[in-house]
């Protein structure tokens, strides 16, 4: 399984997605609001906003919530100014971790993130210490039921970099600059994606087992539980057998 999707698969198996829907909504509303403030309220002319709205719809967020978040962004944010930044560090076993945050209090957030690293047998590093281990890419995911050959042909023609047949899904990878263009072309060709986003894909993986694997999952869980954290990326790999032991 490709590394960038490992955590989402594990969360699904743990049944964590539904339990954390409230937090997911909070993070998505913040992303929609900031995207609308920075790039305007028209998703057709604001790729970041359109991606955020699509994610929200994928999580079954009510339309009213989405519209309120856009209005909040375009009409001012009631004095709240969010700062976007990325923290980097190492998890158990030396796995690289990138933490994207959106915060109105940087001192609070950096303290929280550092504490989570420490409590889960990891350590926070300097800017740039692990970001070079990841590539920023557009990732469009399709169900296995899609005709691979037809999707491959359409994706390459639309400008995609790669199409891979993974264990549980088909993944189309693009350069971030033409991500929306490729996605739109594939949708027009009749291919409906399960998800589409610009993400960070690890170049190599770090295999974890035993206590290191347990602590790594705790670290990911606690990072995502923090209201200021928008996204967490890592290059850890945990085998199916190891996951079964922990479930």
From Swiss-Prot:
Keywords: Cytoplasm, DNA-binding, Transcription, Transcription regulation. It is found in: Cytoplasm. GO terms for molecular function: DNA binding. InterPro entries: Integrase-like_N, TACO1_YebC-like_2nd/3rd_dom, TACO1_YebC_N, Transcrip_reg_TACO1-like, Transcrip_reg_TACO1-like_dom3, YebC-like. One of its GO terms (biological process) is regulation of DNA-templated transcription. Signal peptide: none annotated. GO terms for cellular component: cytosol. Its main location: cytoplasm. It holds the Pfam family Transcrip_reg. The keyword Ligase does not apply. Belongs to the TACO1 family. NCBIfam families: PRK00110.1, PRK12378.1, YebC/PmpR family DNA-binding transcriptional regulator. This is Probable transcriptional regulatory protein Geob_2326.
